[in-house]
Amino acid sequence: MITVLRIGHRPFRDKRITTHVALVARAFGASSIYIDTRDDELENTVKKVVDNFGGSFEVKTGIEWKSFMKKFHGTKVNLTMYGEPIEKRIDEIKSGDDILVLVGAEKVPIDAYLIADYNISVTNQPHSEVAALAIFLDRYFDGKELEKSYEGKINVVPMNHGKLVKYIPDEDQCLMILKSENADDLIIRHVETVYKVAMRMADCIPCDRRLVAAGALLHDIGRTKTNNIDHAIAGAEILKKKNIDDRIVRIVERHTGAGITSEEAQKLGLPVKDYVPETIEEKIVAHADNLVSMDRIINLKQLMDKYENKNLHDAALRIKKLHEELSSICGRDLDDITKDL
């Protein structure tokens, strides 16, 4: 674990550069940054980045740096142009478990040099502390830190030309998206009830709750265009155009019943491919939708009767199987966990 300690921070002068130090620390593999001077605005900026882009990076300001450095259990490294070349000591530093990396803003006190186990330079020429931290972390992790993936609300899609960002909207943003597509009260009431059922399932089934929440609220957005069997496909197309995360798009596309097979899709006049839910989030949203009629929660028997009355025997069996699968993972019958909603 690598902790970055930033000392000499002056909020009126260093806010931008210290923010960059924090962002580099997060992006290049450190787990946290501690800053000596209290700066709530800087803390909130970094926390917002973590919230939007993912990860578990920690930031805290207002730390008494000297006592923090002395009490740190691990290897203490002071990055300075006056230190030994990084190539000479990096293997020794790697042998430690927890590493504290000190990055100074203004002139670093001599005490920091004396407390540090290593005074390390990436070059003995004047340079930016942001660059020094990036190079140190890259040498420490041998470039593997750049392979780390993050699951956030905002996900950058690598492009050769242009730029593309996919979003995981929160609950309020989902409702705004629905209203922007002129969803009526019937749709809103229905998806809000499906959301309640889906999130109750998510309480006992390991899953990505962000995807379940967004998928549940957006699953019927296609009904703003059509109420036919192709409304799920229409909804997926709407969300694609809005750069919504592909995992949510697939939840919406595959939410009908317990899914539609490619053979059934062909008979129904849909683009021929499988629309059967695969991920646990897709299954949760699909079945939460099954258990809601308009804005009323129903049980499995009522659901099965509805399908059997329409002579949809195969679809009814798939729904029953999906109900049993999710109930098994939950450890309780889903009818039991939703009856008090």
UniProtKB/Swiss-Prot annotation:
It comes from the Archaea. Its EC number is 2.1.1.206. One of its GO terms (molecular function) is tRNA (cytidine(56)-2'-O)-methyltransferase activity. SUPFAM superfamilies: alpha/beta knot, HD-domain/PDEase-like. It catalyses: cytidine(56) in tRNA + S-adenosyl-L-methionine = 2'-O-methylcytidine(56) in tRNA + S-adenosyl-L-homocysteine + H(+). Homodimer. Belongs to the aTrm56 family. NCBIfam families: HDIG, PRK12703.1. This is tRNA (cytidine(56)-2'-O)-methyltransferase. It comes from Picrophilus torridus (strain ATCC 700027 / DSM 9790 / JCM 10055 / NBRC 100828 / KAW 2/3). The lineage of its organism: Archaea, Methanobacteriati, Thermoplasmatota, Thermoplasmata, Thermoplasmatales.
